[in-house]
Amino acid sequence: MSLFKIRMPETVAEGTRLALRAFSLVVAVDEHGGIGDGRSIPWNVPEDMKFFRDLTTKLRGKNVKPSPAKRNAVVMGRKTWDSIPPKFRPLPGRLNVVLSSTLTTQHLLDGLPDEEKRNLHADSIVAVNGGLEQALRLLASPNYTPSIETVYCIGGGSVYAEALRPPCVHLLQAIYRTTIRASESSCSVFFRVPESGTEAAAGIEWQRETISEELTSANGNETKYYFEKLIPRNREEEQYLSLVDRIIREGNVKHDRTGVGTLSIFGAQMRFSLRNNRLPLLTTKRVFWRGVCEELLWFLRGETYAKKLSDKGVHIWDDNGSRAFLDSRGLTEYEEMDLGPVYGFQWRHFGAAYTHHDANYDGQGVDQIKAIVETLKTNPDDRRMLFTAWNPSALPRMALPPCHLLAQFYVSNGELSCMLYQRSCDMGLGVPFNIASYALLTILIAKATGLRPGELVHTLGDAHVYSNHVEPCNEQLKRVPRAFPYLVFRREREFLEDYEEGDMEVIDYAPYPPISMKMAV
């Protein structure tokens, strides 16, 4: 019933509206950083052209072909557009965004060779009256975020220069640089990545993720070249990796209820910014975002029946909701997949007597989430805005006692921050999930109260790595963390509990492949 739901404010969309779209940059330089003379490229390396085409065209999904429904965008200056031979305009399979203070989209279409091509590519060319910032603002709008997977800045010199300055540089997720060993340099336009610690670096430290061996072109001149990828240092994900590394090196050997055994330390903390739509979804291993989102929304509705998750393909509770596991806990009267008064029930009905998952608990117990939302609206400086899932009297009735059990909210300068306390922290499987889950919770509570998301502070009690996770965690530690993605909302709802996973989308998430780790039960 709506009487017991949390109504969203009329300004619900304002606090989480994306301002600028994240992007990557593709450039070819000589050994001195030269990119050309402002009119043409002073070398011919077909392998680099193929790399450029493949990178800017290919989508992340397996065997997914570009279409107007999903494709990448390439942003270029007017001179770069003019340097493309007319028969190759627009660059196929991509949205071509051309920066020009004089030309309109129609002017660019009129410049195509024939009417058939103009009709064919009417939705593949966009002119922007302004610079890169204006293009990124356009591509962050709801008209483009659903259909554009990755934005690439492809030059020329002035556009590259803007890419390396604030505000654009803070959205720059990767630099793909090809270095050409040219016989002589005739360049008058240059691209150089600012050195860390200088004013020009704008607080960003660039790290090399990959570099190829030196290659030889088949262009007839045996030109030498190599590829490299630079990414901004992600100090927030490094907190997580450093903690995992410390636990593996220094952790205490502990025995646990699963019989697997752990390496463990006691007491740690990590901090993650949620500002400007950034979502701390770890990149060194793909995090199951759909599972994160479905479970968190399930919590917010006060649900306890895990079959509702498994029916949506989210099987994270299947083992702990199995008949055998429930019976081992003495919960023989529960229907299979009924987890008892776990997380969401305590969030929304703390203290109510639990019978079974499909009973009506409206108005029963303390609705901690609703109370926090009301307090945030009326007294945001209150120091009692916290909720707990740890109810000692109800623990025997739960399939599992809560691991993440306490959260407190804090408001400063119109921003909402959350501190999570987690008693038991499975660093390999659980913690990446928990970080994303409480980030989403904070974002949704901020939306419900007209605030902007601020920071997630994650405090860990028993932080451990299971013995069978040490090897896969060591594999993960070899990876250089990439930039975090962003969260955008496709649809707003009248009530907080009515949000669905499809109402939101994670964009610009380019993690490394998954690493298999078996859950300890």
From Swiss-Prot:
It catalyses: (6S)-5,6,7,8-tetrahydrofolate + NADP(+) = 7,8-dihydrofolate + NADPH + H(+); dUMP + (6R)-5,10-methylene-5,6,7,8-tetrahydrofolate = 7,8-dihydrofolate + dTMP. DUMP binds at R257, H404, Q422, R423, S424, C425, D426, N434, H464, V465, Y466. One of its GO terms (molecular function) is dihydrofolate reductase activity. Pfam families: DHFR_1 (PF00186), Thymidylat_synt (PF00303). Pathway: Cofactor biosynthesis; tetrahydrofolate biosynthesis; 5,6,7,8-tetrahydrofolate from 7,8-dihydrofolate: step 1/1. Its EC number is 1.5.1.3, 2.1.1.45. Substrate binds at V26, D48, I154, Y160, T178. Keywords: Methyltransferase, Multifunctional enzyme, NADP, Nucleotide biosynthesis, One-carbon metabolism, Oxidoreductase, Transferase. Residues 22-232 form the DHFR domain. Gene3D superfamilies: Dihydrofolate Reductase, subunit A, Thymidylate synthase/dCMP hydroxymethylase domain. NCBIfam families: PRK01827.1-3, thym_sym. In the N-terminal section; belongs to the dihydrofolate reductase family. In the C-terminal section; belongs to the thymidylate synthase family. Bifunctional enzyme. Involved in de novo dTMP biosynthesis. Key enzyme in folate metabolism. Catalyzes an essential reaction for de novo glycine and purine synthesis, DNA precursor synthesis, and for the conversion of dUMP to dTMP. This is Bifunctional dihydrofolate reductase-thymidylate synthase. It comes from Trypanosoma cruzi.
